[in-house]
UniProtKB/Swiss-Prot annotation:
GO terms for cellular component: cytosol. The keyword Magnesium does not apply. The lineage of its organism: Bacteria, Pseudomonadati, Pseudomonadota, Gammaproteobacteria, Pseudomonadales. NCBIfam families: cat_per_HPI, PRK15061.1. The active site is at residue 92. The record marks 88 as: Transition state stabilizer. This is Catalase-peroxidase. Formation of the three residue Trp-Tyr-Met cross-link is important for the catalase, but not the peroxidase activity of the enzyme. Heme b binds at residue 257. Bifunctional enzyme with both catalase and broad-spectrum peroxidase activity. HAMAP family: Catal_peroxid. Keywords: Heme, Hydrogen peroxide, Iron, Metal-binding, Oxidoreductase, Peroxidase. It comes from the Bacteria. It catalyses: H2O2 + AH2 = A + 2 H2O; 2 H2O2 = O2 + 2 H2O.
Length: 716
């Protein structure tokens, strides 16, 4: 018998020590290769918007209504109604969104993948998804999981007597976990790394929750202290990261806790492993409990055993009634979690599964915050005294919660999209220009004759378009918000702002196009001039139709989060990033939905076009600035140049001749990474080769056009 026959089979694909094990700080270029067609079973020709048009929307909603009261033996409905758990599922799908980087949220159906499917805060939500499966199976690809999660939450509210604000579909599923979202550095669930929360209980960017594995905050108060006043700071920190204000916070918490219950029938030691850690025969279900039946009255989820209202399957104002009517004393759930019970109160809260059995009202520590925090308390009292104001505030806040990460309203699908434009949707006016081919040609001629350099033209277009974020679909060139606060005041945009008056002059003289279109067209003219100077004739694709937003349509505070701490494409950095500069370049590329080859072509092209934010010479490895050549790559890979940092910060470098020691170039880490990182160097070598000149021009034009049109959802 051979040695192979005697030994265990231990050489499966992907086994063994990985590059990440050897070099933990290796640049994550792989983040730019996520969600490719190779992982999508529907194929590149599948169009979700077209598939959704074929959906029998009324029939789907009717099926969801029936599901709400169709209690299953394997997971019985609390109070005979699944609505509360579907509200929780929808909330926790959308609730991972954070404004800091636009990542997270419910727009991609990520809740069914790790780590979210196994977060402690999502315990037993896997059961809600399984309850939905027969409906998803029936309607197939005409409704995405991502849309179904949110719609199920809406229908749950409606089936319990609440009037929702509306629903917009359009969330397209992906087929693997997002790798780009930084959920934190903790290695234990519910841990708190010092990098997440500082001594003043302030969340650091980009995190949106106070603990690893929580959607928001610890419901027992900071560090399970039971301190409802201290909890206010954590609540604000997390909800503010979702762009919610105090009124929306109160409405969401109180509205959500009008329904259902929390589950803590026994200590958490009774729970089995989460879905990703469960055995294969569990078929993706987790947290199997060995306490009693394991479900129904014996359910162990959060460890808290709280029912807030006397009508937990019906909309009411009873949450606020109980909150203000009773005094509260600290107690513990059967699982040992800190919670509150109404003092000297009658047993008026129905049991979820035993008819005729009642309990005293109970609350979470974070519920009491809504009464005893001075500012939250004022809002809560107003909602208590004006139930209609509460209902309206909750409807609007719920709509915002579940749609905040979808981008502009133009992306919404379906018959229930509200007509009202909301400021958080970054509204745009109706188009008033429709330039003809002759109009566009005239504008291009005016731009070419303006005296603006290639670097100026390219810089202004890049500054306008590169605010786009693929996570929440915000930003981009449409709207020309570069000319408005806050973007006009950003440090990185000051070169571009100096160019704007000339483009405004051209736009007004023509009167045939929006400023937004003129800005993009200016960049295209610059690229065409640079390509022609390199000996390659190109027509950069241009799609007119952009409009110009007004300042009153632009929430300054909301747009402030779109400002990049670093934009390596134009060699900009605020400094003191806390991470290697080149990681921020990859981060920016990922937000722009670029591939690694697109990143490479764009940086190399922008450098020789002279598009640095401050006009500096860092990375401008050419004596033909304004020509779209491959000089950046040729000279970067030239072994006759030796690089050395100019100081201990290792941020700026000098490239000297190997023989004469004379300074030839200067560069930043954003430049040198294309020679140091083995993957990026492989791409750089393609463009530095003798047959790479024309390829670079064509690849640059394609990537450039992609960035200019990232927010053109009207073109889909």
């Amino acid at each position: 018998m051979s040695n192979q026959g005697k030994c265990p089979f231990n050489h499966v694909a992907g086994g063994g020590t990985t590059n990440k094990d050897w070099w933990p700080n290796q640049l994550r270029v792989d983040l730019l290769n996520q969600h490719s067609d190779r992982s999508n079973p529907l194929g590149e020709k599948f169009n979700y918007a077209e598939a959704f048009k074929k959906l029998d929307y009324k029939a789907l909603k009717a099926d969801l209504v029936r599901l709400m009261t169709d209690s299953q033996d394997w997971w019985p409905a609390d109070f005979g109604h699944y609505g509360p758990q579907f509200i929780r599922m929808a909330w926790h799908s959308a609730g991972t969104y954070r404004t800091t980087d636009g990542r997270g949220g419910g727009g991609r159906g990520q809740q069914r993948f790790a780590p979210l499917n196994s977060w402690p805060d999502n315990v037993n939500i896997d059961k809600s998804r399984r309850l939905l499966w027969p409906i998803k199976q029936k309607y197939g690809q005409s409704i995405s999981w991502a849309d179904l999660y949110i719609l199920a939450g809406n229908v749950a509210l409606e089936s319990m007597g609440f009037r929702t604000f509306g629903f917009g579909a359009g969330r397209e599923d992906v087929w693997e976990p997002d790798q780009d979202v930084n959920w934190g550095a903790e290695v234990a669930w519910l841990g708190v790394d010092p990098k997440r929360v500082n001594d003043e209980r302030e969340l650091t960017a980009p995190f949106g929750a106070t603990h690893m594995g929580l959607i928001y905050v610890n419901p027992e108060g900071p560090n399970a202290s039971g301190d409802y006043l201290a909890a206010a700071k954590d609540i604000r920190a997390t909800f503010y990261r979702m762009a919610m204000n105090d009124e929306e916070i109160v409405a969401l918490i109180a509205g959500g806790h009008t329904f259902g219950k929390a589950h803590g029938a026994a200590p958490e030691s009774h729970k089995g492993p989460e879905p990703e850690g469960a055995p294969i025969e569990a078929q993706g279900l987790g947290w199997t409990s060995n306490f009693g039946s394991g479900f129904g009255k014996d359910t162990v989820s959060s460890g808290l055993e709280v029912t807030w209202t006397k009508t937990p399957a019906l909309w009411s104002n009873n949450f606020f009634e109980n909150l203000f009517k009773f005094e509260w004393e600290l107690t513990k759930s059967p699982a040992g979690a800190k919670q509150w019970v109404a003092k000297d109160a009658p047993e008026i809260i129905p049991d979820a599964h035993v008819p005729g059995k009642f309990h005293k009202p109970t609350m979470l520590t974070t519920d009491l915050t809504l009464r005893f925090d001075p500012e939250f308390g004022k809002i809560s009292k107003r909602f208590y005294e004006d139930p209609q104001a509460f209902a309206d505030a909750f409807a609007r806040a719920w709509y915002k919660l579940t749609h905040r990460d979808m981008g502009p309203k133009a992306r919404y699908l379906g018959p229930e999209v509200p007509k009202e434009d909301l400021i958080w949707q970054d509204p745009l006016p109706a188009a008033i220009h429709n330039p003809s081919a002759a109009d566009i040609a005239d504008l291009k001629a005016r731009i070419a004759a303006s005296g603006l350099s290639v670097g100026d033209l390219v810089s202004v277009a890049w500054a306008s378009a590169s605010t786009f974020r693929g996570g929440d679909k915000r930003g981009g060139a449409n709207g020309a918000r570069l000319a408005l606060a806050p973007q006009k005041d950003w440090e990185a945009n000051q070169r571009a702002i100096k160019v704007l008056p000339k483009l405004v002059e051209i736009q007004q003289a023509s009167g045939k196009a929006s400023l937004a279109d003129v800005i993009v067209l200016a960049g295209n003219v610059g690229v065409e001039q640079a390509a022609k100077a390199a000996g390659v004739a190109v027509d950069v694709p241009f799609a007119a139709g952009r409009v110009d937003a007004r300042q009153d349509q632009t929430d300054v505070e909301s747009f402030d989060v779109l400002e990049s701490a670093a934009d390596g494409f134009r060699n900009y950095s605020k400094g003191n990033l806390g991470v290697p500069t080149e990681t921020m370049l990859v981060d920016k590329a990922q937000l722009l939905t670029l591939t690694a080859p697109e990143l490479t072509a764009l940086v190399g092209g922008l450098r020789v076009l002279g598009a640095n934010y401050d006009g500096s010479q860092h990375g401008v490895f050419t004596d033909k600035v304004g020509v779209l050549s491959n000089d950046f790559f040729v000279n970067l890979l030239d072994m006759n140049t030796v690089w050395k940092a100019v100081d201990d910060s290792n941020e700026v470098f000098e490239g000297r001749g190997r023989k004469d020691g004379q300074v030839k170039y200067t560069a930043t880490r954003n430049d040198l990474v294309f020679g140091s990182n083995s993957i990026l160097r492989a791409y750089a070598e393609v463009y530095a080769s003798s047959d790479g000149k024309e390829k670079l021009v064509k690849d640059f034009v394609a990537a450039w056009t992609k960035v200019m049109n990232l927010d053109r959802f009207d073109l889909a």
